[in-house]
């Protein structure tokens, strides 16, 4: 039987989703808005003669045909028709100066492709979609083909860009050209080129050649871009539908200018010189509708930016972008035609288009969690662009030196981050802004499903069109953890707590320490921030992470065979900007984090510069192998079967690092670190399925099989419990919780909602009330039911019905339960963070019918119950005797259970 078991598991592993070799419509990224795939329709074969009939010339379309072996013949059977139209039905558009309507319609059948677009840019976007559908066939030696489909697509936001800081670093012109080619495939349409900095001036100024002389640069001496190179790059970008926005930062970040020229930018000499420079910039970038003039992080003299903006507008006929906020001035229309919001303080300027860059600084990102945050976030609180919200730009600031230009791309995870950001901008939406949604990947639900869809598509392209690029990101949506509540360590990172000393073969879900129960929480993802760098502006896994705490995380990894693998492991992501301190020799970080595989500790890497000060803006000193993106993967060996991964995460004295990040990264890869290992199962409950166990803090619904009675209280007043007195009466919370009037069941209505029923009198909490008014009890069943929704605090839930939301009031309202809602009374728009709306639940009692059918046991597998938990060497699933699936690893109460293994079913009785 043992042989049979593992044969089955190997087969199951082979059936897991894998990257197919050839592209399908389901691989298009960004995800198109409207897709209709006809059934049984034949594809359009490439690598043949085609007739191109076009109202709009398009270099990108011609390049696509040539790349895929198509030759033009006006009499060919296969035809491609490009038609200019006045509008695309159903597409969204808004006015943004210098940015065209990009909507298109694409229809593919066996011998005909029809492209409809309002502008030439729309044709380019259609060609980029065709390029993706044809992807992957060359690797298999097959003739590329295009799946039959009808697509209507458009961008929700018109600015979807990336910024490279080449003033502090340097990227070759070939690297930039490659980025434009590859990013444009994903409809990224703006390249913000930050050309000048305090470390170096990279734009050739023929009037002032000393600016680019090696002796006037601090880092990457002598490296700059000639005007001819810039002109060629802009022309190439335009063919791909990419707009370049060159930036000459003024008057700050200008040390090189001041040193070389001998005067400050805001002096009269400086202003005159800048106008000469801007004139050369405009001549070099004839297609650039905007010139970025910076303006931030320095005290501005009155009228300086206004004078420069006026010159750009009136003398050069271009529009002006400035950073937002400025140090000592408010942005106004005299100094800017567009703003780029770069911090929490950067807010939308009414009457101007604004680019959201506030939390999109990849130099601070880890590889996994921050990508989740930026993908699932809306863009500046809105789901589609308008005249005041232009879009987003993903920016990389390289204040800290890295070894190579490839390190800049890899350590900032730029391909994954930029494509995720641009995908959100094209698709629109995002359930919540990152200030509310944070960077934690939900375990289930719409946001999780949306992210998995993105991840699968991105990884397909990583394996094909992006296969040569330095992309550290691998699949993470199947990586599951349990993370404990933080234990108090009193500043001692070495202090040991119960999870670390437990000898259970399956770790518990609750631990008692000094009379206090510490819960565990289910988590998903290869990277988790217990405390984000921008906490509490950006929420973290812990709602209130504090100093001098220790948390633990663990999972069990099922491997169908013994195998050597790699692992990406990290406990502190060093930002690519800011002064820092290297990790201590022999330790993973400066906090004392540790990790074990199968109870064997995994040693820390050999650091190239342990305990060393790493200064930003230094000419020589920079990052080496501190981040896992700059190291080979850790070599590990997985046993056949379950492998325990256990992590200790102290947070003592902020870790002695410049930034307070409390985090971890772990995922198993191939030995090269390029891809996730197929067929592995990450389960902290040793479940062989990818099922997510129900949150143990979420109350169970009562039904005919079992009745569950709960007391509940709010985060605001945890000592007060709602009580029912009589029908039609308000529900008042008191400190009394020993009587049946404070106990409630959540009775399943069978429609995804429930009734809230009091144990003492059978009264219901009625949802019929007005906004900001008391809730009352009812003797009759309500017409509609309540629902649980996760609150902002892990382990807490809100209770909602339509546009009603239960709130625990204060003494001024007599501690009554009120209908709070969100004020707007829009269904689904609930308060997740109000302490009075967040509730926790304590189970008082569960009652079950006395008649229980006796299950049969068809096996005698080695199954025991030790300390109230199932212990077996075999993978198993746990069920109640009535067949309901139960969380694996739970503490069993008195009763009977069925343990299902591959060797059969075993009944166990707990007395």
Language-model regions, residue ranges each:
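Acidic, contiguous N-terminal accessory segments
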Residues: 11-15, 21-155, 322-327, 333-337, ...
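Feature activates predominantly on carbohydrate-active enzymes
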Residues: 99-290, 307, 623, 645
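Active-site neighborhood of glycoside hydrolase catalytic domains
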Residues: 257-338, 342-349
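Flexible, acidic glycine-rich loops studded with aromatic residues
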Residues: 333-335, 343-478
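Accessory carbohydrate-binding/adhesion or oligomerization-edge regions at the termini
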Residues: 453-543, 576, 607, 644-693, ...
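Beta-strand-rich ligand-recognition modules
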Residues: 579-664
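Lectin-like carbohydrate-binding module/patch detector with strong preference for beta-trefoil
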Residues: 692-849
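C-terminal outer-membrane/trafficking sorting elements
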Residues: 853-911
């Amino acid at each position: 039987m043992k042989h049979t078991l593992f044969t089955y598991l190997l087969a199951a592993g082979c059936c897991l989703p894998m990257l197919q070799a050839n592209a399908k419509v389901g691989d298009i990224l960004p995800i198109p808005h409207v897709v209709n795939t006809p059934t049984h329709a034949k594809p359009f074969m490439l690598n043949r003669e085609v007739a191109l009939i076009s109202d709009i010339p398009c270099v990108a379309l011609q390049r696509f045909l040539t790349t895929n072996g198509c030759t033009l013949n006006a009499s060919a059977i296969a035809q491609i028709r490009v038609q200019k139209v006045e509008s695309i039905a159903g597409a969204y558009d808004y006015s943004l100066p210098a940015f065209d309507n990009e909507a298109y319609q694409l229809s593919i059948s066996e011998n005909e492709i029809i492209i409809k677009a309002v502008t030439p840019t729309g044709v380019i976007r259609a060609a980029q979609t065709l390029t993706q559908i044809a992807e992957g066939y060359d690797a298999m030696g097959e003739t590329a083909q295009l799946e039959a489909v009808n697509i209507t697509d458009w961008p929700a936001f018109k600015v979807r860009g990336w910024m490279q800081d080449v003033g502090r670093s340097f990227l070759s012109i070939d690297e930039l050209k490659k980025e434009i080619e590859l990013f444009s495939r994903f409809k990224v349409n703006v390249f913000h080129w930050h050309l000048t900095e305090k470390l170096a001036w990279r734009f050739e100024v023929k009037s002032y050649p000393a600016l680019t002389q090696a002796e006037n640069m601090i880092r990457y001496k002598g490296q700059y871009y000639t005007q001819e190179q810039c002109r060629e790059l802009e022309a190439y970008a335009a063919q791909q539908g990419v707009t370049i926005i060159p930036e000459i930062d003024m008057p700050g970040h200008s040390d090189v200018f001041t040193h070389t020229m001998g005067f400050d930018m805001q002096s009269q000499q400086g202003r005159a010189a800048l106008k000469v420079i801007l004139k050369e910039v405009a001549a070099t970038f004839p297609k650039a509708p905007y010139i970025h003039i910076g303006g931030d992080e320095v005290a501005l003299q009155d009228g300086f930016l206004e004078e420069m903006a006026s010159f750009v507008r009136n003398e050069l006929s271009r529009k002006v972008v400035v950073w937002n906020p400025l140090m000592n001035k408010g942005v106004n229309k005299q100094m800017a035609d567009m703003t780029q919001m770069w911090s929490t303080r950067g807010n939308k300027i009414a009457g101007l288009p604004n680019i959201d860059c506030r939390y999109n600084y990849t130099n601070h990102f880890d590889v996994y969690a921050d990508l989740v945050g930026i993908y699932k976030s809306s863009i500046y609180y809105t789901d589609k662009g308008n005249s005041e919200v232009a879009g987003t730009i993903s920016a990389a600031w390289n204040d800290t030196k890295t070894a190579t230009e490839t390190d800049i791309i890899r350590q900032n995870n730029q391909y994954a981050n930029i494509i995720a950001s641009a995908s959100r901008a094209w698709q629109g939406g995002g359930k919540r802004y990152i200030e509310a949604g944070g960077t934690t990947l939900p375990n289930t639900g719409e946001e999780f499903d949306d992210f998995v869809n993105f991840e699968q598509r991105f990884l397909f392209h990583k394996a094909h069109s992006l296969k040569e690029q330095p992309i550290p990101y691998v699949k993470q949506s199947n990586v599951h953890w349990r993370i404990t509540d933080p234990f108090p360590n009193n500043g001692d990172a070495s202090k040991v707590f119960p999870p670390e000393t437990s000898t259970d073969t399956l770790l518990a879900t609750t631990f008692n320490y000094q009379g206090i129960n510490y819960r565990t929480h289910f988590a998903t993802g290869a990277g988790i921030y217990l405390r984000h760098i921008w906490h509490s502006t950006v929420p973290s896994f812990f709602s209130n992470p504090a100093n001098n705490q220790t948390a633990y995380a663990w999972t069990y990894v099922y491997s169908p065979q013994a195998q050597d693998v790699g692992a990406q492991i990290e406990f502190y992501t060093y930002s690519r900007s800011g002064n820092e301190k290297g990790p201590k020799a022999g330790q993973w970080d400066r906090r004392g984090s540790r990790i074990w595989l199968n109870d064997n500790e995994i040693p820390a890497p050999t650091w190239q510069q342990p305990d060393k000060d790493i200064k930003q803006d230094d000419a020589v000193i920079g990052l080496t192998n501190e981040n896992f993106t700059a190291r080979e993967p850790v070599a590990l060996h997985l046993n056949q079967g379950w492998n325990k991964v256990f992590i200790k995460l102290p947070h003592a004295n902020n870790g002695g690092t410049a930034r307070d990040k409390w985090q971890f990264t772990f995922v198993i890869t191939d030995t090269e670190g390029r891809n996730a290992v197929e067929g592995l199962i990450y389960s902290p409950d040793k479940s062989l399925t990818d099922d997510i166990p129900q949150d143990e803090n979420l109350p169970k619904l009562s039904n005919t099989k079992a009745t569950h009675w709960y007391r509940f209280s709010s985060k605001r007043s945890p000592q007060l419990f709602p009580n029912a007195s009589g029908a039609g009466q308000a529900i008042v919370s008191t400190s009394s919780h020993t009587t049946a009037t404070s106990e409630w069941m959540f009775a399943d209505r069978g429609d995804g909602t429930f009734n809230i029923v009091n144990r003492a009198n059978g009264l219901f909490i009625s949802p019929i009330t007005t906004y900001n008014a008391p809730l009352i009890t009812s003797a009759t069943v309500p017409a509609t039911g309540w629902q649980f929704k996760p609150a902002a605090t892990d382990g807490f839930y809100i209770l909602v019905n339509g546009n009603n939301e239960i709130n625990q009031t204060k003494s001024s309202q007599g501690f009554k339960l009120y209908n709070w809602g969100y004020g707007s009374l829009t269904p689904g728009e609930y308060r997740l963070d109000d302490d009075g709306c967040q509730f926790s639940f304590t189970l008082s009692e569960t009652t079950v019918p006395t008649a229980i059918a006796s299950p049969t046991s068809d096996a005698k597998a080695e199954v025991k119950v030790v300390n109230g938990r199932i212990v077996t060497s075999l993978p198993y699933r746990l069920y109640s005797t009535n067949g309901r699936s139960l969380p694996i690893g739970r503490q069993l109460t008195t009763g009977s259970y069925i343990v299902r293994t591959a060797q059969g079913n075993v009944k166990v009785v707990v007395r």
